[in-house]
Amino acid sequence: MLGPHLPPPPLAPSEGRPTPCAFQIPDGSYRCLALEAEESSGEEGLQGEVGPTDLEEDEGVSRSGDDSACRVTQGTPQLPKALGIQPPSCSREEQGASQHDDRASQDWDVVKAGQMMTASPSPGPGPRVAQKPALGRSTSLTEKDLKEAKARSQQIAAQLTTPPSSNSRGVQLFNRRRQRVNEFTLESHGQRGQKPSQESLRVLPSSLPGHAPGLSLSSTSLPEPGPPRHPSPQSPDRGVPGHSMEGYSEEASLLRHLEKVASEEEEVPLVVYLKENAALLTANGLHLSQNREAQQSSPAPPPAEVHSPAADVNQNLASPSATLTTPTSNSSHNPPATDVNQNPPATVVPQSLPLSSIQQNSSEAQLPSNGTGPASKPSTLCADGQPQAPAEEVRCSTLLIDKVSTPATTTSTFSREATLIPSSRPPASDFMSSSLLIDIQPNTLVVSADQEMSGRAAATTPTKVYSEVHFTLAKPPSVVNRTARPFGIQAPGGTSQMERSPMLERRHFGEKAPAPQPPSLPDRSPRPQRHIMSRSPMVERRMMGQRSPASERRPLGNFTAPPTYTETLSTAPLASWVRSPPSYSVLYPSSDPKSSHLKGQAVPASKTGILEESMARRGSRKSMFTFVEKPKVTPNPDLLDLVQTADEKRRQRDQGEVGVEEEPFALGAEASNFQQEPAPRDRASPAAAEEVVPEWASCLKSPRIQAKPKPKPNQNLSEASGKGAELYARRQSRMEKYVIESSSHTPELARCPSPTMSLPSSWKYPTNAPGAFRVASRSPARTPPASLYHGYLPENGVLRPEPTKQPPYQLRPSLFVLSPIKEPAKVSPRAASPAKPSSLDLVPNLPKGALPPSPALPRPSRSSPGLYTSPGQDSLQPTAVSPPYGGDISPVSPSRAWSPRAKQAPRPSFSTRNAGIEAQVWKPSFCFK
């Protein structure tokens, strides 16, 4: 995405190192990456991207691992060390310097051709755009093209250095969130402090993602490549370092990506994207922390492998036709790390595929090489391809997959992406790798770049591709989209990475995993570009959330969600390289000729189709909403007209039934009901006005009308709407029945109080008192309270509840306490003897606590009314109560019983409810006491 500002590099590689090119990206994360690069390998010269078009394609970011400098110059000039942009493959310690030189020479030559393709096809500041379709890598780029690419890359870098709309609300919010996520992820990984020193080679994968700052578009869009690539056991090693650097550079890149998404992506609103991206970043950050820890613990060679894959990827990008030779040599030179990069040679076999596909694959390969999740996948695929060091194999295999899928075709596009990758290698690599994985599925070689196993890659890659795509989705999409959005013409690499990977991921997961690379690539280039652009954030996040949890998700190649997106896109499968440059592809006609070089079918359509299709989708969506609204609006006026003119129409017609029937069909059940009601009225009135026969008819109808006024709506509905009307009529009848029942129930409630003289009192007492005591109190005591209650009940309206509630407060507690002891005595003697024991029992209760005496008083109150009913008992009980309690207690109990009842009479409903509840509450308390 970010074209490094590089002087026209010599066509011949300088010791496998690209000529130094300076990225003008004052990014803090970028600087940190540079520091890491210097610390990790002071000897290496960072590869610079020749240009957004040329550099991305040619991007061979080379980084020397300890002894050997990774010379992945795909014709790309060296990047200044300060840039901190080092190829993930730079840590290839196994590769010899001579091998690097060979690669550099081969790759550089290829880059020339790719750059020429890129520069010539893209008239606008579209080195990115031109690179995307740059299918003919064989053609050498002229120095003018290189200069143009440099200028374009400088412009892009300047733009990227300062977010285009940093003041936008969405960007600010996203930046805050991303900072939080980065703090969490980097701190958890311990990479902020570790990046410069601890992660030298290991960080190279991460520093490559860290390089993403220069390449912020691709790096940001690949902010969390590591987690998506978790599927492979070694993905944590890569993903973690890559993520730290990516996180650091994500702040600028993700913000730009969000802006781009807002402008280009219709499906995913900015807020939604930010939320999803933040969730992915958080989830990926966890994965990255784990992965980084694993990577740090794991031997240095895996990081070296990661770097070497990046170099290979860049080389592959640089040389579409020479990709086979150079990547093959590279893979043979670096069995562990080179293989990943060698995949581009393997991909060379599918060179027939459009260059854009190769570019995607190579950029993806670079991303995996950066030390992002791809490492884990490569290990799985490596088993298929070559026996390499486990960590190295894994990463290499990932790169292989990416490059193999579209070796020659993808080279131009991928080199474009590679150019972006140098600045943000790990993030871009993650994102790119995911798209490459998808593209690669048919051609991706499983682990052996040396073997050029395009066939094998096609067979084995699908699994690997899914895994890598998943990783890529996490971070890179945001970066790439961000870059593309703010600028009408975005760096093709960054945009292609962001847009491609989601699309490729979806397409490959759902559709493309089995599909062969070459045919799918042309499909990619055409319309999927735009669709991919809109989809990338959602699909990437979704895929990442689903896949990242387990390395097992690699089979997600069969993942359904991405296919749905593919379905949404007319050419969803294989717009990966187009995806990143939807905007610029449209702007640049050159990409069309480039795509036509390898497969001109899809590329021109994709360019023109991206903006047009996006506009069409937007327009179609808007039209859909308006269309839905319009039908809603039209029926409403019709209903109004029908309702208003129903009477007139019916009058005009001798019989309004026909009109009514017609109207209900058009308007619906409810509308028909309203209209039908006037219809019978009209029928009656015109019948009366008509001649004698109509009068007879009116007489016949009149009874119907009389009977109908209530059922009319139902009958009319039944006539007009059928089942609907019948159901409606049934509902109405049921409602009426229920209403009647409720009215009947209310009188029943009123009736209940009248019999309450006997039953209600018993009902009230049993609810309040324990079972045994209820029986005892019912006969003697309840009748007089019933009379008292009845007197109060009619006043309150609800007689039962009040008396029960009033006693329950006072009587229930004492009864409950005494009930177990008194039940035997009281049940047998209901006369004064039970009252006395009750008083005796109450006496001990009084000292026990304040509550028992109050209940005791109410209890005698109950007994006292019962006794009062029978004069003999009255005399007995007061005497019995008075000696233990004293003269005060006996009067207090009746006073409390009577006065509170009289006072509480107005509270019947509340008292009844509370009484039942309180009785239950009191029982346990007294029993426990």
Curated annotation (Swiss-Prot):
<dbReference type="GO" id="GO:0003779">
    <property type="term" value="F:actin binding"/>
</dbReference>
<feature type="glycosylation site" description="N-linked (GlcNAc...) asparagine">
    <location>
        <position position="330"/>
    </location>
</feature>
<feature type="compositionally biased region" description="Polar residues">
    <location>
        <begin position="866"/>
        <end position="880"/>
    </location>
</feature>
<feature type="modified residue" description="Phosphoserine">
    <location>
        <position position="501"/>
    </location>
</feature>
<feature type="region of interest" description="Disordered">
    <location>
        <begin position="740"/>
        <end position="763"/>
    </location>
</feature>
<feature type="modified residue" description="Phosphoserine">
    <location>
        <position position="758"/>
    </location>
</feature>
<feature type="compositionally biased region" description="Basic and acidic residues">
    <location>
        <begin position="60"/>
        <end position="69"/>
    </location>
</feature>
<feature type="compositionally biased region" description="Basic and acidic residues">
    <location>
        <begin position="91"/>
        <end position="110"/>
    </location>
</feature>
<feature type="compositionally biased region" description="Polar residues">
    <location>
        <begin position="152"/>
        <end position="170"/>
    </location>
</feature>
<feature type="compositionally biased region" description="Pro residues">
    <location>
        <begin position="224"/>
        <end position="234"/>
    </location>
</feature>
<dbReference type="GO" id="GO:0051492">
    <property type="term" value="P:regulation of stress fiber assembly"/>
</dbReference>
<dbReference type="GO" id="GO:0032233">
    <property type="term" value="P:positive regulation of actin filament bundle assembly"/>
</dbReference>
<feature type="region of interest" description="Disordered">
    <location>
        <begin position="509"/>
        <end position="558"/>
    </location>
</feature>
<keyword id="KW-0007">Acetylation</keyword>
<feature type="modified residue" description="Phosphoserine">
    <location>
        <position position="779"/>
    </location>
</feature>
<keyword id="KW-0965">Cell junction</keyword>
<feature type="modified residue" description="Phosphoserine">
    <location>
        <position position="207"/>
    </location>
</feature>
<feature type="modified residue" description="Phosphothreonine">
    <location>
        <position position="783"/>
    </location>
</feature>
<keyword id="KW-0963">Cytoplasm</keyword>
<dbReference type="GO" id="GO:0005923">
    <property type="term" value="C:bicellular tight junction"/>
</dbReference>
<dbReference type="GO" id="GO:0015629">
    <property type="term" value="C:actin cytoskeleton"/>
</dbReference>
<feature type="modified residue" description="Phosphoserine">
    <location>
        <position position="685"/>
    </location>
</feature>
<feature type="region of interest" description="Disordered">
    <location>
        <begin position="1"/>
        <end position="260"/>
    </location>
</feature>
<dbReference type="GO" id="GO:0097444">
    <property type="term" value="C:spine apparatus"/>
</dbReference>
<comment type="function">
    <text>Actin-associated protein that may play a role in modulating actin-based shape and motility of dendritic spines and renal podocyte foot processes. Seems to be essential for the formation of spine apparatuses in spines of telencephalic neurons, which is involved in synaptic plasticity.</text>
</comment>
<dbReference type="GO" id="GO:0014069">
    <property type="term" value="C:postsynaptic density"/>
</dbReference>
<feature type="compositionally biased region" description="Low complexity">
    <location>
        <begin position="685"/>
        <end position="698"/>
    </location>
</feature>
<dbReference type="GO" id="GO:1905355">
    <property type="term" value="P:spine apparatus assembly"/>
</dbReference>
<feature type="modified residue" description="Phosphoserine">
    <location>
        <position position="833"/>
    </location>
</feature>
<feature type="modified residue" description="Phosphoserine">
    <location>
        <position position="754"/>
    </location>
</feature>
<feature type="compositionally biased region" description="Basic and acidic residues">
    <location>
        <begin position="646"/>
        <end position="656"/>
    </location>
</feature>
<feature type="modified residue" description="Phosphoserine">
    <location>
        <position position="525"/>
    </location>
</feature>
<feature type="region of interest" description="Disordered">
    <location>
        <begin position="589"/>
        <end position="610"/>
    </location>
</feature>
<keyword id="KW-0206">Cytoskeleton</keyword>
<feature type="compositionally biased region" description="Low complexity">
    <location>
        <begin position="317"/>
        <end position="332"/>
    </location>
</feature>
<feature type="modified residue" description="Phosphothreonine">
    <location>
        <position position="560"/>
    </location>
</feature>
<dbReference type="GO" id="GO:0005886">
    <property type="term" value="C:plasma membrane"/>
</dbReference>
<feature type="short sequence motif" description="PPxY motif">
    <location>
        <begin position="562"/>
        <end position="565"/>
    </location>
</feature>
<feature type="region of interest" description="Disordered">
    <location>
        <begin position="630"/>
        <end position="726"/>
    </location>
</feature>
<feature type="region of interest" description="Disordered">
    <location>
        <begin position="826"/>
        <end position="916"/>
    </location>
</feature>
<dbReference type="GO" id="GO:0030018">
    <property type="term" value="C:Z disc"/>
</dbReference>
<feature type="modified residue" description="Phosphoserine">
    <location>
        <position position="702"/>
    </location>
</feature>
